[in-house]
Amino acid sequence: AQAGLTGGEGLPNHRTLYALPDGPQVLAEGADSVVLRLRALEGRDVEVTKVLTFKRGSYVIDVGYEITNRTERPLATHAYFQFARDGRPAEAVEVFGVSTFTGPAVYTTESKFQKVQFEDIDEGKAKFVPRASDGWLAMVQHYFVAAWLPTEGVQRENYMRRIGADQYLAGVIVPVAAIAPQETGRVSTSLYA
């Protein structure tokens, strides 16, 4: 799973290094969650903190950004949340005569569950809802799934593409409201993993 911001120079992407705060970062006895606040090590005009919230007993991780605009002009940006995977099929497994699926999938209320074969991405024939205000995007392998779960009602753009020899991205882009000078904006989504 990868995440980052787009739309301006100096904004962190999925390769940006972050610093942890000093001291232990643990889920305390009796606590329901722990919040990790990671500070991006690059950027002077824009300060970015990645906020990860882990909840006891949950497979859902909240992933968010706090973006402080230190410039004298409004900042327009988007956040992306994606999965990177090779296109090799997982070992062949057949259950009751049915082969399992490996690849990206999108779910929306309107179009339901849409599995996409890596070959269809290669050939430009991938069929999935590119824009929606509900649903999720996942990477599926056999019985395992990881999914980005954007907030319901938030317009998002789903994408899938080949990025190299047998390497693929599947992700979702969500808007961040324009951030005025010297103000802080926030964006978040959830990761099921």
Task: Report each predicted region and the residues it spans.
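Soluble non-transmembrane domains of integral membrane proteins
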Residues: A1-A193
